[in-house]
Amino acid sequence: EQVGIPDADRVRILEILESWFVRRALVKASSQGSNRFIVDMLRHLSEQPAERLADEVERFLVDNHTAVGYLPGDVEVRDALTDSNVYWNYRRSRLRMVLEALEDARRGYPGTNPLAMGPIVRDKATVEHLMPQKWRTHWDDGLDEEQGRDRDRRVQQLGNLTIVTQALNSKVSNGPWPQKRAKLQELDDVLITREALTGGDDRAWDEQAIQQRTDRMIDQICRVWPAPEGHV
């Protein structure tokens, strides 16, 4: 029951649980037995006073070290995402959810000082590669075979992905970078895309840029869905 739980604590409980769910999803932690784990947590919480529920939710998750219930720390999240082929390793809906949350964070949502007129509209965008999967058509750059294999892997990394409308996606999908960049700058209002477009020259979107953006996005993920201070 929620009777007697202060509003601030209720929000904090939801934030803690959301971090637990999302972090476990990102590191692909096992969900087998999760129903029983949640029942055990609810049973434990039912014995606690309302004013301590938020602290008890956090403590219950932090103190749990079983495969079914542990809360992944920043290091594990970073290890799972840094070199990951995220485009194919995660369901598209889950990947879009992460990108939408990162976009909301850049817009100042949720928060008391939003920087945009509103959060991004859910479920309207598609996941787009900045460097296209078919990069050999316009992005060959004279790479040798090994470098080509590395680029095939890099284009699926988190740092090469953004969200665009379906209509814009069809206009820019596989084009060369100068035209694609110009079209995105002209028509796209997604802030996580605009960050990738700022600075550098027309040929600056390469493996190094993708890795640097991947690292920044992982940092943001760890802030959007934080672990309790000191949790590793």
Where are these regions (language model features)?
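A cross-family structural signal marking well-folded subdomains
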Residues: 1-101, 201
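Generic, well-ordered alpha-helical scaffold segments in large soluble proteins
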Residues: 2-3, 13-24, 41-44, 60, ...
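C-terminal, well-folded lobe of enzymatic/effector domains
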Residues: 7-15, 19-26, 36, 72-73, ...
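General "foldedness" signal
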Residues: 27, 31, 35, 40, ...
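Betabetaalpha-Me/HNH-type nuclease active-site subdomain
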Residues: 57-202
